[in-house]
Amino acid sequence: MYAVTVRTRGKVERERYESLREALVAMGRRAYLLEHEDHTGAVGGRILRRFEPVSQVVGRIELRGPRRLRAGLDVRGDGSTEAFRGRVRRSLIVQRRGESAFAALERELTA
């Protein structure tokens, strides 16, 4: 059993899937939608530190599975994405030339 958790702007949605393939398809669909949403601009300024869109995580898609599988995607305020493994100790998944963050995540999990 695989669980996909989507966190966006204070909302949390959870879904369960029987196979890794189904979970990855659902993650890819949600990541695509988040990447192409209209995101906020920079926040903060005079008193607080200014956060540019690339520094803001506007959506996070997390995957949990058997044998302590933990991985996911962060969608940034500028629409860029990063793939990671782990939960507490996250490590970024390096993308190959021309590869999307989702493709890198899929490659890492299905290898």
Residues covered by each model-derived region:
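Short aromatic-glycine-(Arg/Gly/Cys) micro-motifs in beta-strand/loop hairpins
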Residues: M1-E13
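A short, exposed loop/beta-hairpin motif centered on an aromatic-Gly-Thr core
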Residues: G10-E22
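A short, charged, amphipathic alpha-helix used as a generic interaction element across diverse proteins
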Residues: S19-E35
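Short, mixed-charge low-complexity intrinsically disordered segments
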Residues: H36-A111
